[in-house]
Amino acid sequence: RDVLGSRGLGDVYKRQGLDFVRGADRAAQLSALRTQLRLARERGLPVVLHCVRAFEPLMRELAASEPRAVIFHGFIGSPEQARQALAKGYCLSFGERTFASPKTLAALRGTPLSQLFLETDDSPVPIAEIYARAAEAKGVPEEVLQRAILDNYKRIFTGGEYEGPGRTKGDK
């Protein structure tokens, strides 16, 4: 905490998670994640998570830490994994890779607008194209999708009153 000082969590809470493919020590990753989740919870910050072949361990850590809000960045999981995350009130963010995978496209289609984000990450595809393709996949007008994602952003990142992951006062 002393290292962060008055700077806050900045990028610490934005890019945390688990990657069980790249060979980094799993115990070290879990330890770092626990620290980051604790700090985010103490400061009331949402967490944006990177998850590569570590869905179950990551879900266990989230259950133990109960962060204010959770967004799975670059989600490329199965529809079942999406259902598990969505049932906890977490949000899913999809990008260009979504459209190359039938299972991830099914996960996008099953994600409620109130729990959806879109991203480019490091893709050269413009965000406008990702919005257009996602709107088509979900069968909604692009303007409806844009408004829903803007509402999600405001709810999670601009200081609303939260009552658990992905929920604000008044949500049912």
Feature locations, PLM:
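Divalent metal-binding pocket/active-site signature
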Residues: 11-88, 99, 106, 139-143
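Short, acidic/turn-prone active-site loops that include or flank metal/cofactor-
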Residues: 75-76, 96-100, 121-124
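Mid-to-C-terminal alpha-helical segments outside catalytic/metal-binding sites
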Residues: 39, 131-172
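Single conserved hydrophobic/aromatic residue that forms the stacking wall/gate
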Residues: 1-13
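Short, motif-level signal for alpha-helix interfacial/capping segments enriched in acidic residues
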Residues: 96-112
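Short, structured coil segments at secondary-structure junctions
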Residues: 8, 88, 111-112
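Thr-Gly-centered strand-to-loop micro-motif
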Residues: 49, 72, 93-96, 118-120
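Short acidic/histidine-rich active-site segments
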Residues: 114-126
